[in-house]
Amino acid sequence: MTSTATAASTPTVASAAGLRLLAHHDLGGHGDGMQVIRRGDALYVGHVGTSGMGTSILDVADPAAPELVMQWAAPPHSHTHKVQAADGLLLVNHEKFPYRAPAGGPVSAGLAVYRLDDPLRPEQVAFWRSGGRGVHRVVWTGGRYAHMSATPEGFRDRIWLMADLSDPAHPAEAARWWWPGQRADEQPGWPEGQRYAAHHALIAGSRAYLGYDDAGLVVLDVSDMTRPHLVSQLSWDGGSTHTCLPLPGRGLAVATDEQVTDGPYAPRRSVRVLDVSGESPAVLAGCPHPDGFAGLPLRFGAHNLHENQPGSYRSERLVFATYFSAGVRVYDLADPRRPAEVAHWLPQPPPGQPVAQLNDLFVDDGGLVWVTDRIGGGLYVLEPDSRLAALMAEART
């Protein structure tokens, strides 16, 4: 399979400052993109699953002309919307598909492990079975442990798990942690109507920073990876906390609250800057919230951040975020108490959609921004203009 982006498929831009479109790919007509990560000349894209597709692999040796090399369908009744790649391995989650009425039949629940001897043609070497509803998100930057959120048997909702990948052909659970009350035989202690559930953990030194839905930020001590324990927790109005990105050199973290409700006028979900320099975290400021989108249909609000993985563009000053119908937003945290928006990019709605739904993004080491649309827009490749490129160079960690 080979499919190359063409000028005829290039979308028009609704609004932009600091970023411009370099290329677009419709992912072979399966445009429901989710997590995206670049490693060398290979780009890995997970799919939300509404199209039935699971994973796409593209050759991006020429970023202006990505070529679709391989696609795998999602297993029945499941989706595989998250991808991580490092140390010659590709990890792909398997989870019960949540976006349509339940159907009979088995669910694929766990984590697939692929070798990347040929980065464009992965070969599966293992599957770790989680049971239950499966693995929602995995974070892995290489090394022994992969960090996952999953709902295994016997739990009400997603908890935090670690898998030991020291033998990639035989992954094994190394540890798990959950908020008291999540296990089915425990009594929940959080307010009625709230949800306490792990989304994912980002690791900095001996600390894991978890977005934990209505529990907000949860910080765990992982100095012994096999015995995690709670250090601190911070919540705020709104909930639905998704990502907590540590900026360890500055004692900060950036948190997104995921918009999970269609508009118009859904609850506000935004981006916050947190002080995590001590064991009592605090909210410092909110990032500017885009105007003019609240009355639109579908999702408007924060979702994913570029997560500063090794091998990517890394900054403790510039934050890249997806905002669904408000596109990509770039914030400057030079003064963390007064974050400023310094760039944005938004395409016209893809065919058949009332608005864009930009979903996830990855900023590569060269400064290109790879972005997906969750419904049908596929993949966008953005490049910074000279002003933003200079700022990115100055702000690089």
Regions found by a protein language model. Name each.
Residues M1-T397:
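Feature marking well-ordered beta-strand scaffolds used for ligand recognition
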